[in-house]
């Protein structure tokens, strides 16, 4: 199994709000993406940073985001080999 790790840095109701955070993350050197998701609570756009090779790199990124007052979640995507 091969896994990639990501940090979800925000959930937003509007694309414009997600884009604002994306631009902030680009300013500090990340290459974030916006994903359109369906949710029951109305948050339709998430901002994702990564992929990272391991949880340690993901945790470092999450700590950097925390210093910028951005909460984040760890996300993992695994594929069987």
Sequence positions of predicted segments:
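Conserved beta3-strand ATP-binding lysine motif
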Residues: 10
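Extracytoplasmic
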Residues: 1-3, 13-81
């Amino acid at each position: 199994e091969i896994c990639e790790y990501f940090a979800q840095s925000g959930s937003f109701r509007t694309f414009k709000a997600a884009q604002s955070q994306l631009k902030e993350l680009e300013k500090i050197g990340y290459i974030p993406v916006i994903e359109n998701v369906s949710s029951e609570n109305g948050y339709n756009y998430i901002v994702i940073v990564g992929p990272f090779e391991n949880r340690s790199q993901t945790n470092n990124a999450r700590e950097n985001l925390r210093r910028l007052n951005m909460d984040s979640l760890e996300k993992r995507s695994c594929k069987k080999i």
